[in-house]
Amino acid sequence: MFGRTYYCGEITEKAIGEKVVLKGWVQKRRDLGGLIFIDLRDRTGIVQVVFSPEVSKEALNVAEKVRNEYVLSVEGTVVAREEGTINPNLPTGKIEIQAERITIINEAKTPPFVITDQTDVAEEVRLKYRYLDLRRPVMFRTLQLRHRVTKAIRDFLDGEGFLEVETPILTKSTPEGARDYLVPSRVHPGEFYALPQSPQIFKQLLMVAGFERYYQIARCFRDEDLRADRQPEFTQIDIETSFMSQEEIMQLTERMMAYVMKMAKGIDISLPFPRMSYDEAISRYGSDKPDTRFGLELVDVSEIVKNSSFKVFAGAIANGGQVKAINVKGAADQYSRKDIDALAEFVARYGAKGLAWLKVEEDGLKGPIAKFFTEEEQNGLIRTLEAEAGDLLLFVADHKTVVANALGALRVKLGKDLNLIDETKFNFLWITDWPLLEYDEEDGRYYAAHHPFTMPVREDLPQLETNPEKVRAQAYDLVLNGYELGGGSMRIFEREVQEKMFRALGFTEEEARKQFGFLLEAFEYGTPPHGGIALGLDRLVMLLAGRTNLRDTIAFPKTASASCLLTEAPSPVSEQQLEELHLVVNSEKKSEQY
């Protein structure tokens, strides 16, 4: 074999006349009777190789045996393509290689799907043969983008004086948040490690240790129900700083994101990012992670309709609820009664009991509920919703949470269905002024809105144990195009405040000591004020790559059932392994192994 001199996708007209050596995979082979054309592919792209008897009968004979995905080494001369054969869709489309020698490095079975960007093969097949799926150029480009993003983050933070420090993967299980992945200890029978849901406690301990500026491209693990933008193991950009204010951390994050966008995508973004309070986001968009690339904002019309004869609206308001509406501009003729019924079924998934509607015509409002509103009420709706002839008004009446969830989801659906979203935009947004705690009706207790180490707003501290739902957090989330990129906060750094927080979350003194005693003790040794942020790398790459599935940004992802179709993990283990770990599997359906 002979050493490579060029990558396939990097040969240009400047190389015409040169002898080159290429290595790669056969993308396509065409036999034109006496001439064979092979599209040779490597990670940089494709180049056309021509085998002819005039140049080398021996090479032509070998080329006749070649099939798709064979691995080849080819030596030949770069020549210009003839007029009429130029391919403007290829960077190498003006040249081709006249092959003089060819070596079949390895043969290949016929793949279960064609190795091209466009494929309609089931995702399960792609995941089972992930090594073939990753040959598709679109997959390589996505992972190449991931590399550029990660490199840009490291370069930026290094320039800001941050140290990359690795924290433990085998750690202690804590009860907050999602379920832990547990790892049994062989040397400590009946005891378990947990895989980290985040490096949260360790990065705070690094601040106690005086490192001041830490970051890590951290692997994290959560045993939770999955969806398209979740994975059981994921990667986050983890940052922690001492002696910096919330404002300074947010500005640092903005500068980092601007650097990443420039280095990874060649895009300039404007700073600072817009900011919106949590309450405003819920009020205007029905979401704490709003997509601001399009309108369709929620408008509260409760005051206008509270005394109307439409009992659904009046009753909801009388019971402490609200009525909100979305004005879908110019959509009155686009939605039939059947279409609106389908939208009603959609909002029902989010708890809404119905979807009321009105169409705006030149002489007023029309629709099944129009008769219940006086002329003054109709004019009030038209004025408040800035409605014009041809608009479609959609209403939900219920408790505030149901209204926000239902109309927030409907807003996103309408934005997609009506092509209102500018897919070329990257709209970053800070969500601030979060509640510190959230009350769970089922469990009858409070949970941390972010995590138990978030610092409350100082002036709200006296209410932490008496009126916890009123306490605000020094927390901030970064949103991009309707996705939560990540969240950050100032951290509790005083033992007394941390103990108050644990009590508000329902921990007994003994439980807090058992779970977090080491952290509470650390706070007694001169802990600096500190804060940070964690951003989802997988999700960031998904958005920058224009993908809709998180699995497309990870080399070897898990399915929605947290399994790996390639390696067939998780899998049973031997009886001997279980004995060494002091474990017994309690299952009616045991594998034959057991």
UniProtKB/Swiss-Prot annotation:
Site (Important for tRNA non-discrimination): G84
Catalytic activity: tRNA(Asx) + L-aspartate + ATP = L-aspartyl-tRNA(Asx) + AMP + diphosphate
Amino-acid positions noted as binding ATP in the UniProt annotation, renumbered to this chain: R222, D223, E224, Q231, E484, G536, L537, D538, R539
Gene expressing this chain: aspS
One family name in Pfam for this protein: tRNA_anti-codon
S-adenosyl-L-methionine is among the record's keywords: no
Protein name according to UniProt: Aspartate--tRNA(Asp/Asn) ligase
Record's function text: Aspartyl-tRNA synthetase with relaxed tRNA specificity since it is able to aspartylate not only its cognate tRNA(Asp) but also tRNA(Asn). Reaction proceeds in two steps: L-aspartate is first activated by ATP to form Asp-AMP and then transferred to the acceptor end of tRNA(Asp/Asn).
Record InterPro entries: Aa-tRNA-synt_II, aa-tRNA-synth_II, aa-tRNA-synth_II/BPL/LPL, Asp-tRNA-ligase_1, Asp-tRNA-ligase_1_N, Asp/Asn-tRNA-synth_IIb, AspRS_core, GAD-like_sf
Higher taxonomy: Bacteria, Bacillati, Bacillota, Bacilli, Bacillales
Subcellular localization: Cytoplasm
Family recorded in the similarity comment: Belongs to the class-II aminoacyl-tRNA synthetase family. Type 1 subfamily.
PROSITE patterns: AA_TRNA_LIGASE_II
A molecular-function term among this protein's GO annotations: ATP binding
HAMAP family, A to Z: Asp_tRNA_synth_type1 (MF_00044)
A single BP term in Gene Ontology: aspartyl-tRNA aminoacylation
GO cellular component, one term: cytoplasm
Region described as Aspartate: spans on this chain: 200-203
